[in-house]
Amino acid sequence: LRKRNYLNNKDILSEIHRSKNTFCSYVDNELHHQFDIIVSSVDEINKDTVEEARKNKAKRLSTAEYERRKMAGEKVKQAECEVSPDSITKEELIFRVMTFDHIPEEPGRKKNPKTIADTKVKLNFPPFQHFKYNEEDEIICVGKSHWQGGMENGSFSLGHGKATDKLALMWLKLVDRYATRGNVRGYTYNDEMKGQAILQLAQIGLQFDESKSDNPFAYYTAAVTNSFVRVINIEKRNQNIRDDILEMNDMNPSYTRQNEGEWEASVKRNEEASHSSFTDFSPSSED
């Protein structure tokens, strides 16, 4: 039976990109939304990064062409769809620069700011700008995150975008699948754990930084795991408090507490029995 892939990094990355684009403004949405390389500053745009960006763009175009022809029903080899990096001009490349330059400051948001992000408005994902070479070989800004309007006459905006419906469905699917794992599916508060995990993904789902990793599935799984464990720990603490109150009032605690007590007592009895049988045994001496 063929194994079915219900979620993969490629699809998740694509939806994260589309979701972030709803918070961005570009000079030309079709030409400037897709970045070819991520750098930390404009100073890093040089000959080496240009060559790397060419290779990245060629690989992406080759894969897209292969999938397009395959979907059209053609019997085609991937080698036939290869795009040469040399065929891509420098002016076609888009550089994503991770920067806070266009984000307004918010003094006092953090008592002891440690990074530049602590001095700026709180954002739903790391901010960036898109740059490219123009015909005069100058590097110009063609896109900004958390922005509305033109590059020069636009304004900062935080609430005009949203996660795509497909990305939201991916979050729900991931939580549903995680909730069926053997170590969590038996809990009576399984729904509370799922709700907490969905809330967590809605809050941090777009904070995934493509410049640091290309594995959003692991990022999301870790967030879901933390949410489930947090609810389990809270419920266990509440149950222990409830059982303590019941025992203080000479009432029977939960079956979990009773079973734990019986188990601990049986373990103790077995240990004492094995210890006494060992010490009482004395081999007979031969004359």
Model-derived features with residue positions:
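Extreme N-terminal regulatory/targeting segments of RNA polymerase sigma factors
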Residues: 1-189, 261-262, 277-287
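A short glycine/small-residue-enriched secondary-structure motif
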Residues: 147-151, 195-200
